[in-house]
Amino acid sequence: MRVNALLPLSGLIGTALAACPFADPSALGRRAEGGEVDARQRLKEVEVDDNGQFMTTDFGGNIEEQFSLKAGGRGSTLLEDFIFRQKLQHFDHERIPERVVHARGAGAHGIFTSYGDWSNITAASFLGAKDKQTPVFVRFSTVAGSRGSADTARDVHGFATRFYTDEGNFDIVGNNIPVFFIQDAIRFPDLIHSVKPSPDNEVPQAATAHDSAWDFFSSQPSALHTLFWAMSGNGIPRSYRHMDGFGIHTFRLVTEDGKSKLVKWHWKTKQGKAALVWEEAQVLAGKNADFHRQDLWDAIESGNAPSWELAVQLIDEDKAQAYGFDLLDPTKFLPEEFAPLQVLGEMTLNRNPMNYFAETEQISFQPGHIVRGVDFTEDPLLQGRLYSYLDTQLNRHRGPNFEQLPINRPVSGVHNNHRDGQGQAWIHKNIHHYSPSYLNKGYPAQANQTVGRGFFTTPGRTASGVLNRELSATFDDHYTQPRLFFNSLTPVEQQFVINAIRFEASHVTNEQVKKNVLEQLNKISNDVAKRVAVALGLEAPQPDPTYYHNNVTRGVSIFNESLPTIATLRVGVLSTTKGGSLDKAKALKEQLEKDGLKVTVIAEYLASGVDQTYSAADATAFDAVVVAEGAERVFSGKGAMSPLFPAGRPSQILTDGYRWGKPVAAVGSAKKALQSIGVEEKEAGVYAGAQDEVIKGVEEGLKVFKFLERFAVDGDDEE
């Protein structure tokens, strides 16, 4: 029996108060400024509108560029054709190196609004006034796949946020999982080399179901915690909108007078958490590789701007090792029982990019982009990222001036002595670009904690010790937290993790690597190891109970809470062009869309009122499937055979929707469609009856999102 042994520890955690007991308004400067903010206003000066204009060269002359200059109608193209050379040359250089990780992504602009004046916990300007707004840009991504890989590959997902604050850019470069695979950044190349495609044949793409990945995971036990999260629904979210975000590392927040606390950053989705199931994600990768980026784009374009709340966990500096692990260890998360989440503000993504390359591809996030009031810790993974992210941008952009790209420019302006370099965009008036200098009158002046609201390192931070190449012994426990995570899932979610590990490990060809996997799993849970061993045809290991416990924590399960909103979820209405069914489908669509759902009517061909044909439709595109009255005719007999769609496609859509845990329904006589695929009307998440009754049921079912009763759990088939 499980018991919750994680109890709140009163008195240990500082509380964020929306009031500042010591703030001097005259010292706060820009902090007090507020007002409405346009998410893309800063980019308008570099927008180019071709409407009503003639074609020009890159240097501004009007041209015709559809035909190259030749010697006669059938002659050679002339070398002097600068128009041809410029057009082809520019095309040849349109791409920059893709990110070595997080190459596949999508982004959006938005606004962050502070819920209060949080100057009692941080000097950060963007958190210094109630209702203060700050423009943001967020880039969501997968980690391992190339830029052309599928959105729904099982992976950790990037959640990188830039705040364009009035005191410089601040980036939270996080993921949708609160922990990471390694503890020391020096092992990052090893991690990525292991999960990337094999260097001999470039296979597999965006997948870890291969020998090298699991060789690394089973040889590097620090990876197990993140691995368990990735094997759960967190690795295959329903959309970017339906996942949380985490800063991963422990940072510091510092007040104006130098008082500091340790902090963990959290983004909490206001859409609710939701995930796909594995087969659904696999099929979706083939049916619509752009599913997540299309979902984000469509939601924003339709006025359904997604939002998240920014929350923090605050910890006293002297409590870094008070909870049984080290807060400097990025493979550990801080259970909410020890430090409750304190919500600071809300972010809404309300503008899509105007140009993917100029904005989403060229934005250059860095953990080193911090502002006054925020500081680093000695987390060894964070320390390495501070170097690596800057270095990779130098590689991608072939020089140091990538911060001058419009998407990277701070709204606060840039004044320093950095000069020249490839792609220099500024014309600097200061010819005495060095400091100190009498000739430039001391400008740009030095800013610090007391003058000019400059960045300052936390007062009192010290570092000393014997030089060595090792990790602290406080980082050594690699098994307690993965077990805590697994214990905290519902039984079906646990089964999903087991099934995912079975799937991945079954692709491993080396027998010793498979045995190593079982050995590591056994240190987390003998039950997990035994259940995986059965699928691999291997002998189960004996229990290794050193780290076994029955503790649970809250906030890690995806499926045990109903969605707070069903707006923008997608419903497929199966119909037919025969017998008046389309009229019934249109009525269904009208009613469902009143509640913010996105409804697609499907039939044999694109008649009036049909949004998609059966030949183009698939259950992966919908969160619920409803059969309109009269459409039962396409589920059996001659109606199921048509040259307009693959044989049995209507039944396949309904069956897959049911198998993948979605709400399924039938109106009136269409309940015969449910019967034809062997689905009982009384099952959870199955609705049949009159239109109003079905609509009510489907909308309630969408809040549940996935009906876990439909998924088998190990032992269910035992008598």
From Swiss-Prot:
It catalyses: 2 H2O2 = O2 + 2 H2O. The active site is at residues 102, 175. Its EC number is 1.11.1.6. Residues 19-30 form a propeptide. The keyword Repeat does not apply. Heme binds at residue 389. Disulfide bonds: none annotated. One of its GO terms (molecular function) is metal ion binding. GO terms for biological process: hydrogen peroxide catabolic process; response to oxidative stress. Belongs to the catalase family. Occurs in almost all aerobically respiring organisms and serves to protect cells from the toxic effects of hydrogen peroxide. This is Catalase-3. It comes from Neurospora crassa (strain ATCC 24698 / 74-OR23-1A / CBS 708.71 / DSM 1257 / FGSC 987). The lineage of its organism: Eukaryota, Fungi, Dikarya, Ascomycota, Pezizomycotina.
